[in-house]
Amino acid sequence: MGLFKPKLRSDIQDRIKEIDPRVFVSIPHVNGLPIAENTLCQIYYTDDNLFIDGSGQSFNLSNEKISAIEIKTDVEIQKQYVSSVAGGITGAIVFGPLGALIGGRVKEKKIKNTTRYLIITYTSDNEIKYLGFDITYTPKALEIIKLFNKNNLNKNIIEL
């Protein structure tokens, strides 16, 4: 990640001018659309609609059909066992063969991978459906949630 934004393709620039979104992000698709997983999608959020372009297809979701836009965080912890050659050599020099055994012993190393997903819940044909996108490296996607929540404060009230 650098200080400069990458230059957008001309077709994406034209689409931004056409739609005039409040928020625009490019993020990988995870599930919910009839396109391949990890396909890079352009999402244009306006006050009325959510437009999604990906894999040569365009999708339009009215904000009235959207019931929630949320973030789900998935944490995966991997354990790796590594031995230290340098520790073994240093141990051998300082303490002899016993030092080599202690210095070069196998150690457990934990790697924590955190993945963040943008989950869009909507209703289609009287059925609740979901769209999922990977936003681990796209903090700007949080703006979509803020705008949606700001514009839909009383929407989730259910009349009994």
Where are these regions (language model features)?
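Acidic, Ser/Thr- and proline-rich intrinsically disordered linker/docking segments
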Residues: 2-12, 69-160
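Anionic N-terminal interaction surfaces
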Residues: 1-49, 55-58
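Phosphoinositide-dependent membrane-docking surfaces
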Residues: 50, 60-77
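Short, surface-exposed beta-strand/loop "edge" segments at domain boundaries and coil↔beta transitions
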Residues: 51-52, 57-61, 126-132
